[in-house]
Amino acid sequence: MLNAWHLPVPPFVKQSKDQLLITLWLTGEDPPQRIMLRTEHDNEEMSVPMHKQRSQPQPGVTAWRAAIDLSSGQPRRRYSFKLLWHDRQRWFTPQGFSRMPPARLEQFAVDVPDIGPQWAADQIFYQIFPDRFARSLPREAEQDHVYYHHAAGQEIILRDWDEPVTAQAGGSTFYGGDLDGISEKLPYLKKLGVTALYLNPVFKAPSVHKYDTEDYRHVDPQFGGDGALLRLRHNTQQLGMRLVLDGVFNHSGDSHAWFDRHNRGTGGACHNPESPWRDWYSFSDDGTALDWLGYASLPKLDYQSESLVNEIYRGEDSIVRHWLKAPWNMDGWRLDVVHMLGEAGGARNNMQHVAGITEAAKETQPEAYIVGEHFGDARQWLQADVEDAAMNYRGFTFPLWGFLANTDISYDPQQIDAQTCMAWMDNYRAGLSHQQQLRMFNQLDSHDTARFKTLLGRDIARLPLAVVWLFTWPGVPCIYYGDEVGLDGKNDPFCRKPFPWQVEKQDTALFALYQRMIALRKKSQALRHGGCQVLYAEDNVVVFVRVLNQQRVLVAINRGEACEVVLPASPFLNAVQWQCKEGHGQLTDGILALPAISATVWMN
């Protein structure tokens, strides 16, 4: 049986001056007479003959090589392999062998040069919902000011840190977390191994979640105001930590001066057809503003308006640019529901405006990290390079949920085996370049989902498997605050509980696992920058290997009973002296002995 081996990393892809050397390994019987490298120049398909190499990379392994000219053409170099016999042909792509030529966007792809933020793939991100992470002392009186929350029809509720979260008035209940509280807890985050923070919205807004922006140019006084963000920026820089903000540009809040539903005298668009901001929103014939998904407090912004476009992203002091400049110097934006942003109350010309946001950000801060929020398929935006990455729900979170927690995003039952899970993950990332895969934003859960610990239910023993997976799969791992100490909770608002700072309320063994996995990732170039090959996926067991030059990291996930797994022969496993770095599995002569419900990591 013929087998082919290729990953878009060294030793298979190497740059030599103005050429990119592409190598394919073959093992097994019935080798082809010829191999052509299918590549493209300015979107035109080309076939380049590959040459069989005299030297073998390993005994029994044959290498074929060809070169791609880098002196011209687009930076994203897509390619696949056409194997030819005298009477037939087969194609080899990221998803294996096929009798059909691959779709253009499902080939191997590398970016040379890579214009994305070079720092992103090395990070350990930590997502913070500011009101629920840490409360600073002393506090300004303005931070605990009680006001009427129009969207909820009541005054906001202030609670003590240890009071339980309830379903009542979820968007109006405040626990007092703030940005100075985050600053005070940076030593804790440093101890965990965190290198970058992603904050849910911090700008002035009436709700606790702040997705109903009232002022894009000032931090909410409840969080400590502009000064607290400056202090946090300074403190994170002192520790070498990155800081990414949440940009809510699909809609504003209805209390924003631009809209002014509640008649505060700003001349907003809601009640004033002559308002200078009237065309920043869309209205039906009866004068009702078009909103986001039926939430009247979140009127949609209309990007048909040139003046709105200038205010949000195009202008020299636009909102997007403002927070990336000194003295703020933020490291990027997470773009809320970015796929829905557009014109005339909908998503018309969405791609044009998302590209404009990213272009403005990169002009201001070339290394800015732009992450789009997509619960669905984000590849359309990624393939068009209008985002650096997406929150990887579709390519990581949801298949992992299906395999370990047997549920989907609608919390409906979903039973999938290892083969289905890996086919799902591999199919999704096949549409992305290698560098894009490394920048995808991977999470087990977030402020918009139930906590993964809660989703597991009676299968709570599988939680460590997910943690190991998070730090070993291609992409940027992000911890949702509190996951590392065992915080649980169903969907909003229960997934937004205050952080349990009392040690007796923390799962210290889980915290230690997070620390170990973060340390492993930081030590391993293969985990941060390597390719990924699934070696085995059947029933309850997933085995994959990360590869970069001579570095190897082998990962085995077993959600079921103790078992033995015979790995298929692979040159990725040959001549490797393995050391077990996490877990208790054993590897002997290509046979894995895996304990029940376990995750094991080996490195060479």
UniProtKB/Swiss-Prot annotation:
Which EC class heads this enzyme's classification? hydrolase
Q: Explain what induces or represses this protein's expression.
A: Under positive control of MalT.
Which NCBIfam families did the record assign?
PRK10785.1 (NF008051)
Q: Which UniProt keywords are listed?
A: Cytoplasm, Glycosidase, Hydrolase, Maltose metabolism
Q: Which organism is it from?
A: Escherichia coli (strain K12)
The family database entries (Pfam families) matched by this protein are listed as:
Alpha-amylase, Alpha-amylase_N
Subunit comment:
Monomer.
Mind telling me which residues the site (Transition state stabilizer) is annotated on? D448
Recall the GO molecular function terms of this protein's record: alpha-1,4-glucosidase activity; protein homodimerization activity
Q: What is its main location?
A: cytoplasm
Family stated for the protein in its record? Belongs to the glycosyl hydrolase 13 family.
Q: What is this protein called?
A: Maltodextrin glucosidase
Entry GO terms, CC: cytoplasm
**Reaction(s) catalysed by this chain's protein:** Hydrolysis of terminal, non-reducing (1->4)-linked alpha-D-glucose residues with release of alpha-D-glucose
Active site, per annotation: D336, E373
- Identify the coding gene: malZ
| Gene Ontology biological process | alpha-glucan catabolic process; maltose metabolic process
- Enumerate the PANTHER family for this protein: ALPHA-AMYLASE FAMILY MEMBER, MALTODEXTRIN GLUCOSIDASE
Enzyme Commission number, as recorded: 3.2.1.20
General function of this protein: May play a role in regulating the intracellular level of maltotriose. Cleaves glucose from the reducing end of maltotriose and longer maltodextrins with a chain length of up to 7 glucose units.
State the compartments where it is located.
Answer: Cytoplasm
> What start-end ranges are recorded for coiled-coil regions in this protein?
none
